[in-house]
């Protein structure tokens, strides 16, 4: 059920955070502990499938639910936007990594256009891995991990490069 899956996703996040994971997830263990607000990842894990069974696209329905939740609890605009984006886009990284060529620069360009920040990339990577691992133990394997990691690393390089170029143009404008 969705409830069981949600508990497994959150459990996986916690195990990753404290390091109770396969050694192949060492980088992910380090990354999850560098997230600025890990509670947003946990909330994304709780909310990501909440729209299922309500008729329509569960990602979009979940996005609306999380927006109301954040508003009711006076979350900052930034945190509301990040959490809503994560819920709405929680399937994108898995889909792109498994249905397109993660080595193709065009794939990376299109993916990073949607993600557009390193912060979102880090969160969506953590959510995606723990979502897949929480779905069915046989769904998670080294092939899927390698594809996701390749998409993550290539996207991180591209976003870092864009950030450096943006900073250089800001400095040039100030001269």
Can you say where each PLM-predicted feature lies in the sequence?
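Divalent metal-dependent catalytic cores for phosphoryl transfer on phosphate-bearing substrates
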Residues: 28-161
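Extended, charge-enriched "interface" segments that sit outside catalytic cores
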Residues: 160, 164-175
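Active-site-adjacent "gating/activation" loops or surface patches in catalytic cores
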Residues: 1-45
């Amino acid at each position: 059920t969705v409830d069981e899956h949600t508990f497994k996703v959150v459990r996986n996040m916690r195990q990753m955070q404290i390091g109770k994971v396969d050694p192949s997830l060492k980088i992910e263990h380090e990354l999850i502990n560098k997230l600025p607000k890990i509670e947003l990842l946990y909330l994304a894990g709780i909310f990501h499938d909440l729209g299922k069974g309500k008729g329509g696209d569960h990602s979009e329905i979940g996005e609306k639910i999380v927006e109301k939740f954040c508003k009711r609890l006076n979350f900052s605009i930034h945190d509301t936007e990040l959490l809503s984006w994560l819920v709405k886009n929680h399937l994108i990284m898995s889909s792109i990594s498994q249905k397109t060529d993660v080595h193709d620069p065009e794939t990376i360009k299109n993916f990073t256009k949607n993600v557009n920040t390193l912060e979102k990339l880090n969160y969506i990577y953590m959510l995606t891995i723990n979502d897949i691992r929480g779905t069915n133990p046989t769904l998670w394997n080294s092939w899927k991990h390698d594809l996701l990691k390749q998409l993550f690393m290539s996207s991180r390089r591209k976003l870092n490069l864009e950030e450096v170029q943006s900073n250089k143009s800001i400095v040039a404008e100030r001269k």
